[in-house]
């Protein structure tokens, strides 16, 4: 729903300093609606953009067969030499965020940071992560590799899985 997307964008915008320059928001994990509201909120808040038209690009990448993040030729000018923010639904292990960072660096972008609805970490390899919700909000939150799940090893069934699509009960 758009109301919640707008509220998430408003919460995230309040976490950035007004001298932060954002030219492009790279939306991961289906966050395009939030990204559009975030671009609007940044513009309304007086945040800077070096784009000639003074608006912020909102784009999404593709994944190739090796799960690498790529951008098509028409999107590369929106990354190269641009101040880029990564927007994610959740950051748990940092693997997807790391792939996004590598891709933006490969295409010549200037990484400004990452934003997420939920993040289990505050930063990844020096990249700050601003999130609406974090481990302080879910103190019992844990992540386990599927090969090393303590509940599975104890013979207990998992109640649910959480991924970018949401909460999925394991009925």
Where are the language model's segments positioned?
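Active-site-facing substrate-recognition patch
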Residues: 1-21, 164-171
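Hydrophobic Val/Ile/Leu positions in short beta-strands of Rossmann-like dinucleotide-binding domains
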Residues: 27, 86-87
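Conserved acidic residues
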Residues: 22-23, 82, 112
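PRPP-dependent phosphoribosyltransferase catalytic core
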Residues: 101-171
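Short, glycine/charge-rich flexible loops or terminal/linker lids adjacent to PRPP-binding catalytic cores
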Residues: 35-85, 92-95
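Short glycine-rich phosphate-binding loop at a beta-alpha junction
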Residues: 19-31
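Short, highly selective alpha-helical patches that border small-molecule cofactor pockets
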Residues: 5, 9, 31, 35-39, ...
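A phosphate-binding catalytic loop at a beta-strand-loop-alpha-helix junction
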Residues: 91-100, 104
């Amino acid at each position: 729903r758009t109301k919640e997307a707008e509220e998430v964008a408003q919460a995230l915008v309040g976490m950035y300093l007004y001298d932060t320059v954002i030219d492009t928001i790279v939306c991961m994990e289906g966050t395009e609606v939030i990204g559009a509201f975030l671009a609007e909120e940044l513009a309304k808040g007086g945040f800077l953009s070096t784009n000639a038209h003074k608006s912020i690009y909102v784009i999404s990448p593709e994944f190739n067969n090796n799960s690498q993040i790529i951008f098509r030729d028409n999107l590369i000018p929106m990354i190269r030499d641009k101040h880029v923010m990564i927007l994610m639904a959740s950051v748990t292990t940092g693997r997807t965020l790391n792939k996004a960072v590598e891709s933006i660096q490969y295409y010549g972008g200037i990484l400004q940071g990452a934003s997420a609805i939920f993040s289990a970490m505050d930063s990844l390899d020096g990249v700050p992560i601003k999130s609406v919700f974090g481990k302080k909000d879910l103190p019992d939150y844990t992540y386990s590799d599927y090969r090393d799940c303590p509940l599975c090893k104890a013979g207990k069934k998992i109640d649910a899985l959480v991924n970018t699509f949401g909460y999925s009960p394991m009925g």
